[in-house]
Amino acid sequence: MKITKRRRKRYGGSLGGDIFIFVVLALLGLFMIFPIYLSVIQSLKPVEELFLFPPRLYVQNITDQNFADLLATASNMWVPFSRYIFNSVFVAVVVTVAQLLFSSAAAYALSKVAFPGAKALNKIIEVALLFTSTVLYIMQYMVMATLGMIDTYFAIILPYIATPMGLFLMRQFMGQLPDSMIEAAKLDGASHIRICWQIVMPNVKPAWLTLLIFAFQGAWQITGYSFIYNEALKPIPTVMQQISAAGIARAGVAAAAAVITMLPPIIVFIFCQSSVMETMATSGLKD
């Protein structure tokens, strides 16, 4: 009984407060999941149900015709559909791993290694968080064109292997680790590389798992319209947008394309989210 009262005091202060918080969070969750639910039911509706007014929030006659039309159209493209899948998987894996490596190494240097200009670099990173990738699109194209990387995998990989958000996230977590742990490892003769990957990284597991989720989600959505013209190098999001761009007549196919495109990031999030919550609940260091 004492534990229950203590928990109520900590979270809501009263039973009514707990109920209010639960209702607000439930409504927020429904609001966030509604677009996904809408895409799924639209992809399962036959044509005659897609254009009903007022629109229905359920499917009366479930059909897979939209997915069949999508795959049939994709199979008639210039290259096999499996090639588009390979392109997206390859780009997503390379970008995700590269972001983890570069962001972790840079965050360790900025948070645990004293060197001239570290504070200025941290400020630059914080300012960079204010800009979206769209602002840098023209500059990225100019750099890729100068390097001769247009119409190659590098054109859609290099701009995303280091992001301010990933670096900021890792730096914030690493900055919470006690300096005494780093100093003890140095006294034992450990190098910065060993300290970073064998001591620091295991203790910031929630951070790099979260970074993996965000990095994969971002990499999976890369289109590279202005960078890739070779059909054999285009990722799935680009192809799906091309297929569903025929207007309102292909509303069901567009919904099916949206479902297929967002499925892998959702699966990755489901598997990694439990690990993030578990490590956040069980880990923590204090000086």
Describe the role of every protein-language-model region.
Residues 9-287:
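A structural signal for multi-pass alpha-helical bundles of membrane permease subunits
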Residues 1-8:
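N-terminal Lys/Arg-rich, disordered targeting/topogenic segments
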